[in-house]
């Protein structure tokens, strides 16, 4: 009840207060109205002085009440609220143009700096796509980090750096001017500058500078490159060295050039001033400038010498007649024309001696299909693989070539052995057969140089009949060549016409081979098949006894040769199945790793419960090399194990089984227990380089430390004549480099085997050997013995941090003095301006004048700096910067073959004047008129003069780089920088790495 009586009372009180407030507001309005009327009456009827007094009192009252609207809490005048400073509006067109500039730059980098050397070792089209994706990932990560950078802090640090630099330069200039009256030399100015301020650690000596640049590149790649790229030690070492020596150091040298600084200022600020006058708009597309006009056809006639009789003619050697309406061909095509005419006689000469090569009809050994073709003992086409086998494709063009080649094969009467390396052909021409004497000589060399390797040839008798039938098939005269099925026409469209060094082996006796036209032979890589793949006819055809080197010596082990076929399991195959034949060598340890990895997968564990693996099959057998009976028993059981796994679709299509069978990977890589993430770029580069070395040096060095046996051990082992004959014709392929990638002491193994097989020491004289030993001793003395495990390339943290000591201390003091002040940038800018005004306007440098300027113009300058930084870092500007950089490297979109001629002193002086005028245009016109044109010009001249010393500019570049790395959150990872290139700075270790890779 009490609550009910209280609530009406409270409601009455609130209602009465509301009424009183309304009355008071109405009274105020009445008072104001009366006051205005009274003033009007006084103005019209009474004294004018009284009106002036009343108006002055009202102005004072308004100023007191309205001060909060103009002045902030700090007591500064906010003029920016009355002066509008516009920023660049967001423009989708600018974003699109920036993306285009990035894509063009990436494509030009890949075209001129990546594919220029990669095409010399491989023509894998997927490499370009992988490289482009990796570089785009790097750019995306860089843009993400740049988007979260505190622009306020960046501007503060840069202004502080400029202020410290300008002050140090003025002091150094005064110190050198006092010492001597003659003109100051650049070296003397740099010495005086170093006495005033501590130079960047990278400027101590050239070696330290290279080390510092290498560490920065390594850090940037580690943080920005998407995983798993550059995870391998060798790959990252190569990329770091290439970028450091060919990109970063030349770029720093270019940026430190005073003339280049003038050009940059003219290009940026002149364009910026023009855009400000015309209105903000995105930069126009420059696609017309980037792509020079190239005529579509040229009157090009290439005359070729007539080929010897009995050799098939090639369309590439026929005269080519092209017409053109263009008045003159482009220089690039003229150079290509000269190169073709100049290289053609040499290529024909190489063709005569049998050392020519081609990628058009060249047997390609870079794919994963025939990575172990050298040990294809059981293949019925092993002898036929020594021939020049042409790819059967549709069309009159290739059909004529195949018929000519088969006719040449039929007339030769002798087979040319290639020792597993494939036929060698000139580009655009097919292979030729060597005379019989060359064949016999090649076989004799093969017998003498072949390593001693034990190979089981249990299936040899079964395959001899197949070999005879296929040989008879080729000997049939006037037999038309079968055309390639229509399902493989896409190969002709892509222009990829490569051959494998060996024809695929036909199935075993369970599926006898038919004529060549009864099956579709695919010589394409199945690294990225169009559909699921069915594994069939899997068998372990033989064993190889090899050796590996460890700390105690050589230890033998057994490799099991696994062969299988793959068929694309597609519903739209229209009756024609695409067959591919694979061979891979695996040791027993890798079978155990396969079983372990399958058991660790929860989704696959249920499928292998009833499959007996190696652990269950051989509980009592030792791990070492065993006698032939146990090896034969193990071979049959391991074959049964693999067949059971492939019979289960879920396991057969699993990543583990396909990696074990080297279906989508390189067969040279070992199958380890824990999979090591290697990017496709690293795999393709390693595969291409290794295959190129195999082709270039087929017999110079052993392919693995287990390939060659000593003569004493060979003599101590009883062998039959049949095995000796088989071993003299075959050698162990390089498909088992894999243990070197999976064992801790891999480098020592590869280094040892390459030095052991190196024949350089056999031709060195005694004096050469002594000089070599002396050089190695000196290199070993250079290496720090006290810290052998420390990464020499890893830049010490003090190198990065100490370069910013002065700037960081100043920034910390500013942050401590006013961490939340609204005019931090303006305060730093005023300090920088005082250095410029001290000589011309000393009356402006007094303390009272500084406080007055800070109160009146502080917030306005702060706002102006923020807007200018936003405008200079907008997408329109980034597109312009990237375009300028790209045009400086690729003028007209083409990388110049020769360096540009040096600029004359007159050109440099003219550019300096233009840069000075561009800086003058940055200031508003009314401010220039107030301060004086000549005095402003003298101040800006002092700024340009401080950038005329290349060493000082280099010091500033490194300091600025440290600031950017810190704000990009990269400098915090210096201590975590992986020792991926630990041998890069040590000459002795560098040699070791170069040999081991």
Swiss-Prot record:
Region annotated Disordered sits at: 313-333, 413-437, 697-728
Record's subcellular location: Early endosome membrane; Cytoplasmic vesicle membrane
Any single GO molecular-function term of the entry would be:
phosphatidylinositol-3-phosphate binding
Which residues does the annotation say bind a 1,2-diacyl-sn-glycero-3-phospho-(1D-myo-inositol-3-phosphate)?
A: 587, 634
Membrane topology summary: Peripheral membrane protein
Q: How does it assemble?
A: Interacts with PTPRN.
Q: This protein is called what?
A: Sorting nexin-19
Q: Which InterPro entries match?
A: Phox_assoc, PX_dom, PX_dom_sf, SNX19_PX, Sorting_nexin_C
The UniProt-reported impact of residue 587 to A is: Abolishes location on endosome membranes
Q: What is known of its domains?
A: The PX domain mediates specific binding to membranes enriched in phosphatidylinositol 3-phosphate (PtdIns(P3)).
Annotated Gene Ontology cellular component terms: early endosome membrane
Tell me the protein family, please: Belongs to the sorting nexin family.
Q: Which CDD domains match?
A: PX_SNX19
Q: Which residues form the PXA domain?
A: 95-273
Q: Which domain of life is it from?
A: Eukaryota
Listed under GO biological process in this entry are: chondrocyte differentiation; dense core granule maturation; establishment of localization in cell; exocytosis; insulin secretion
Bias-annotated ranges (Acidic residues): 422-435
Keyword rRNA-binding on entry: no
User: Which keywords accompany this UniProt record?
Assistant: Cytoplasmic vesicle, Endosome, Exocytosis, Lipid-binding, Membrane, Protein transport, Transport
Is this entry keyworded Calcium?
no
User: Could you tell me where the Basic and acidic residues compositional bias lies?
Assistant: 714-724
